[in-house]
């Protein structure tokens, strides 16, 4: 291209100066050249500027980009600048600057309009998904740079699903009317899996243990179903953070993931990924103290917030929890702008860290406002209630970070970014919350199997963010054999804007147990309120209205309803007919998994009672308690679990308990069938002897889960277990012919081994058990398989 300009010599003579087109096109390669023949000091003047070739772009827009007005003196360099601005605008395919006498003609050829965007060769990713990745759209202006960028985005999209060999070639087809069709020709290639995940530098933990920490998985038996066994750079970055957090929570404060290498296999169809770790040493807490650098603040009042003991493995989470509690105490005392700074002193000799919590006065900065963007469905208040800080409160960076984590933990957003910026005044900040919505509803079609119920079908429809209010609504239908259980659940997690959970549960069930000759039907309605009463303790209050009925006692529904005979205890339950139960109850739970100080040891305790008799037919007190403890040993390769449960039903005002009121013992002791142990009418005149359940139960279960030498990508581990317990106690022990039914406490126990198989469609467990302590009339089961799945 050649640009001619009229030189300002006072006589109107024409002089030509050439700006080489190669110099101008070199701008695209970020190199700017100017012909040495042009003297930058020379100036030119155009009386008029004419525009040619524009169809959609307004002349004023072109003049604005050119920056040359009528009668203005311009240099050759300024002409170059005008060209570059026009060409760099992305609006024109070609640009020419042509002088004609005293007129500068700007001739442009606009980029064509995109007529159709098409994708060819794509099977794994559908057209609508690919269209959402790219910028080029129908009826928009065609841009070569944008099309190339879109090809790269499509390639990345395939890379994210493990198809590293995918190639994308854009094709542009010219059409009449200055239009083009853009086609992306895609060669998807094969999935490039991660064949092996390995580690170097790890001495404290095995590769097997560290692989369980990672979000990325290595290809295994179900490689066709697993989506996390492909090489995704962003996922590996997340894995780096997971590894770092894992080590630091176990006292390795100096841990570093020094690098990640990914190498092709010899066949170039998979990757070997290796994490290079520098562990360092594991530290424990040394001396832990608190001092105050704020006049008038007594540190003794804050010492009780220290829940850390010397000699315990160092954990950043434990330190953060103490800081949060101390700053909360300061706020309750009306001490604003008090911050807690942890000062750590290393003791290399004994590998301890002395932590001194220092109360200091921070800068007086206030929160001007909290701006929330990106929430197209979720209401602002759902996000805002995750912040304990409101407009006008003192600014606390740690609280803002904690609030950001709470927003992410909701599960409503694919991404949640929380940043702060300066407000209108130097002592104010604005908190910007930018979220990206993600689907929160789910439809589940599931299958289940149990030795008692056989094969079952489960249907569920759930919405975790109902109407964008943060509420949960779920409908579930479960069938197994002749049993059916339907339920509707609604949960409002923040009633009245407080940490007060309100729930309603409606349930209807019908059972025809294949191991017993009777049927039951239960319908219940139960609203509840749950709220925290301590950092790790919660209290749940509930009301329950229930109608239940027992019928067809002693009739074999599989044999045309013939009467087989049954215990008079069960016949009495049938004679009372449908019964209404109305009562209130509570459950207190204490769970150390909330803000856990030790990641390897967890403890949960719960105790609850139901007081029935607020109207209805049943007057009773039902009490249940449970303790569960879990720890990991042998470099966290072996998981030990212990569980202790107990319960009691106390009938009031001389009432007798029915089978529907008593405990069945199902699942408490492995090695026995449902209703397979406990009181039983053993009269020889009965064709069938059904279990009667008991007013009391106790159970202790001990499990050990460990690797059995198989590659962990198979997801198979082994386990040993031992159970002991009993179900006992009846209000009416008169059996057939007045014979006494033995309802005393008789211990049962069993041992066995388990095979755990974690599959992409759900966890599967096979139990092989042997009853050790039993009665002759007990019904044993030596094998049990359970699986629960969604697909």
Model regions and ranges:
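Transmembrane beta-barrel wall of Gram-negative outer-membrane proteins
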Residues: 486-578
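Outer-membrane beta-barrel "beta-signal"
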Residues: 461, 585, 753-762, 780-791
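C-terminal outer-membrane beta-barrel translocator/porin domains of Gram-negative envelope proteins
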Residues: 409, 424, 442, 450, ...
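Transmembrane beta-barrel architecture of outer-membrane proteins
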Residues: 455, 479, 484-486, 506-512, ...
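Repeated loop/turn-to-beta-strand initiation elements of outer-membrane beta-barrel proteins
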Residues: 413-414, 441-443, 454, 466-473, ...
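Transmembrane beta-strand segments that form the barrel wall of outer-membrane beta-barrel proteins
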Residues: 387, 420, 440-449, 457-480, ...
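Periplasmic polypeptide-binding modules associated with outer-membrane biogenesis and secretion
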Residues: 2-19, 38-451, 460, 474-494, ...
């Amino acid at each position: 291209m050649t640009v001619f300009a009229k030189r300002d010599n006072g006589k109107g003579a024409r002089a030509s100066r050439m700006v080489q087109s190669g110099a101008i096109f070199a701008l695209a390669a970020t190199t700017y050249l100017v012909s040495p023949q042009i003297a930058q000091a020379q100036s030119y003047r155009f009386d008029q500027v004419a525009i040619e070739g524009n169809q959609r772009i307004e002349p004023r827009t072109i003049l604005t980009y050119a920056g040359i007005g009528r009668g203005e003196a311009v240099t050759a360099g300024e002409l170059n600048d005008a060209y570059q601005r026009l060409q760099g605008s992305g609006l024109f395919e070609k640009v020419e600057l042509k002088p004609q006498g005293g007129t500068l003609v700007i001739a442009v050829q606009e980029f064509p309009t995109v007529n159709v965007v098409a994708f060819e060769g794509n099977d794994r990713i559908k057209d609508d998904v690919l269209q959402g990745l790219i910028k080029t759209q129908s009826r928009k202006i065609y841009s070569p740079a944008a099309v190339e960028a879109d090809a790269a985005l499509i390639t990345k999209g395939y890379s994210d699903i493990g198809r590293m060999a995918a190639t994308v070639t854009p094709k542009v087809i010219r059409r009449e009317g200055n239009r083009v069709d853009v086609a992306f020709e895609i060669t998807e290639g094969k999935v490039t899996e991660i064949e092996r995940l390995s580690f170097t530098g790890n001495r404290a933990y095995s590769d097997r243990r560290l692989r369980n920490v990672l979000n990325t998985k290595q290809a295994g038996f179900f490689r066709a179903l697993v989506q996390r066994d492909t090489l995704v750079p962003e996922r590996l970055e997340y894995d780096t953070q997971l590894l770092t957090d894992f080590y630091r929570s176990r006292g390795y404060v100096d841990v570093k993931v020094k690098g990640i290498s990914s190498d092709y296999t010899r066949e170039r169809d998979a990757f070997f990924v290796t994490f290079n770790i520098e562990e360092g040493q594991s530290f424990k807490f040394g001396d832990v103290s608190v001092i105050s650098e704020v006049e008038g603040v007594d540190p003794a009042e804050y010492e009780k917030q220290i829940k850390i003991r010397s000699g315990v493995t160092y954990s950043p989470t434990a330190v953060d929890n103490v800081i949060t509690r101390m700053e909360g105490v300061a706020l309750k005392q009306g001490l604003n702008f008090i911050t807690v700074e942890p000062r750590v002193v290393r003791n290399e000799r004994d590998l301890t860290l002395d932590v001194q919590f220092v109360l200091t006065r921070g800068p007086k900065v206030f929160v001007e406002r909290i701006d929330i963007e990106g929430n197209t469905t979720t209401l602002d208040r759902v996000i805002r209630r995750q912040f304990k800080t409101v407009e006008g409160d003192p600014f606390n960076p740690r609280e803002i970070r904690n609030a950001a984590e709470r927003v992410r933990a909701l599960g409503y957003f694919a991404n949640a970014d929380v940043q702060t910026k300066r407000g209108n005044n130097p002592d104010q900040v604005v908190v910007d919350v930018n979220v990206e919505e993600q689907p929160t509803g789910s439809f589940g079609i599931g299958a289940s199997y149990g030795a008692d119920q056989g094969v079952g079908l489960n249907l569920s429809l759930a919405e975790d963010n109902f109407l964008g209010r943060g509420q949960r609504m779920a409908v579930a239908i479960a069938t197994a054999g002749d049993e059916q259980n339907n339920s509707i659940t609604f949960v409002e997690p923040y009633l009245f804007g407080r940490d007060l959970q309100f729930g309603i549960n409606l349930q209807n069930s019908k059972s025809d147990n294949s191991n017993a000759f009777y049927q039951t039907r239960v319908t219940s309605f139960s609203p509840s309120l749950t709220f925290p009463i301590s950092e790790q303790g919660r209290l749940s209050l509930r009301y329950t209205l229930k109608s239940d009925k027992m019928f067809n006692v002693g009739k074999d529904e599989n044999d045309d309803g013939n009467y087989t005979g049954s215990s008079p205890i069960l016949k009495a339950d049938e004679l009372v007919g449908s019964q209404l139960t109305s009562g209130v109850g509570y459950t207190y739970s204490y769970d150390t998994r909330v803000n856990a100080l030790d990641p390897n040891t967890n403890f949960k305790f719960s105790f609850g009672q139901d007081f029935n008799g607020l109207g209805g037919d049943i007057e009773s007190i039902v009490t249940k308690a449970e303790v569960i403890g879990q720890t990991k040993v042998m470099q966290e390769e072996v998981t030990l679990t212990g569980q202790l449960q107990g319960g009691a039903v106390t009938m009031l005002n001389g009432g007798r308990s029915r089978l529907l009121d008593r405990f069945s013992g199902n699942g408490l002791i492995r090695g026995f069938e449902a209703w397979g142990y406990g009181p039983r009418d053993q009269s020889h005149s009965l064709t069938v002897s059904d279990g009667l359940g008991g007013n009391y139960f106790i159970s202790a279960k001990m499990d050990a889960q460990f690797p059995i030498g198989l590659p962990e990508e198979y997801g198979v581990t082994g386990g040993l277990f031992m159970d002991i317990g009993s179900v006992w106690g009846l209000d009416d022990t008169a059996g057939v012919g007045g014979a006494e039914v033995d309802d005393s406490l008789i211990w049962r126990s069993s041992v066995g081994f388990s095979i755990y198989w974690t599959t992409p469609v759900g966890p599967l467990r096979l139990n092989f058990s042997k009853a050790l302590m039993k009665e002759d009339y007990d019904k044993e089961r030596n094998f049990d398989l359970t699986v629960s799945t969604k697909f």
